[in-house]
Amino acid sequence: MSIYTDHTWEGVTYAWQNVTMLDSIVTYRGTRVEMIHRPKWGIACYMDNAIQSCEIDEALYHESLVHPVMSSVSCPKRVMIIGGGEGATAREVLKYPTVECVDMYEWDKDVVKLFQSKYPQWAKGAWDDPRLHLYHDDIFKTIEEYPVDQYDIVIIDLFDPSNATYDSWKHLLKHINKWVRSEGSVVMYAGIRERTSSEQSYEMLANMMMTMSGVMDDNILYKNRITPYRVFVPSFSGESTFLLLSSNTDFKIDHTIGSHVTDLVWKSYQTFNW
């Protein structure tokens, strides 16, 4: 009997029985990527032994990440995605007919190649959409530059915020404002809500942005309202949290594109003790 041990949470180990290892690679960026089939749960992606996505419930995460921010801007045309190597974030963005250009910055091209060649069920055709443009640059260097054209929406789909990644997040958030037009919006994955932790990752990011709003006079982005929300994703064994920055505070989710996210998502933050 084959067993895969999952060490996503510190001090906790999950043992998945009767698994099938479909792929195990080390990317040129040094990340170990494992694609595993788990009975009843389907195929899951692990990076450095931490769960990243599972085909049975990835839509819960990706729809929650994308549809609120897409609904916050009237007729969004230009969208920037930071991360999102499975292609599912792009899949949800490209459902909007007003979108003309999606620039996706995923620095690990080996992850993209793996999902393009073997696991198309995540992207569901997004890779072939001519509106999607892929870049494998280091976003933390690219972000220091000034863009040729600003975006209506920026979606940050990166690693969990933590003390170890604090400086990287601070650097990214310091420079991202010049990539977004003044009426645009930004959303970011803000980590898993940990009931056993006294310091939540979404609080760290929110505090970082609120500090920036007070010291960066030219940073219009962080003058906007920060709206937190969350969704429970079974594969993550916890609640994924998100932060939305938008000057538009009066909008509803666009249901014409088949989103399963309801407007009740905004009430989810009320249990945060924000």
Where are these regions (language model features)?
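SAM/dcSAM-binding transferase cores
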Residues: 2-37, 210-213, 227, 233-274
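The AdoMet/dcAdoMet-binding core of the Class I SAM-like
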Residues: 2-8, 28, 54-216, 237-238
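Short, isolated positions in well-ordered beta-strands
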Residues: 33, 52-53
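Short strand-connecting beta-turns/loops that link adjacent beta-strands
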Residues: 40-41
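A general beta-strand register signal
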Residues: 46-47
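Structured N-terminal alpha/beta-domain signature
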Residues: 154-157, 169, 183, 231, ...
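Conserved short secondary-structure elements within globular domains
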Residues: 216-230
